[in-house]
Amino acid sequence: MKVLFINSVCGIGSTGRICTDLAQQLEAEGNEVKIAYGRKGTVPEQFQKYAVRIGTDFDCKMHAIQTRLFDTHGFGSKHATKEFLKWAEEYKPDLVWLHNLHGYYINVEMLFDWIKKHPEMQVKWTLHDCWAFTGHCSHFTMVKCEQWKSHC
């Protein structure tokens, strides 16, 4: 099986290590695995065989600026996402396993449109935080914010 993880980082931080731990286990079971990531940071040598970068540091910075100006987190990075999806189309994963989609590196609308075009793919989403369902607040309990329930 061909597995594609999508996460903000690869091999570093908590979610990056979770992805690489899963990748190693899946590979040991005979699967082919790639981890698409978007944030800068050095991918440790032993995990570079999995790593596929989405965009550049400049793309992330532009997405962050767009987010600050227009409150559109997750809707920037159109060119980077388009190029990544071209690569993913060629890779043809059997399973797409989503992790952290926030981090100014991928356009979620384009990503989900692509996923919808491939009903044959399995999709899993590990929710490491609350960003996906709160209007982009990853840790609402920590900051004691309940606005996401009515108007965020």
PLM segments and residue spans:
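A short acidic, amphipathic alpha-helical/loop segment
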Residues: 18, 109-114
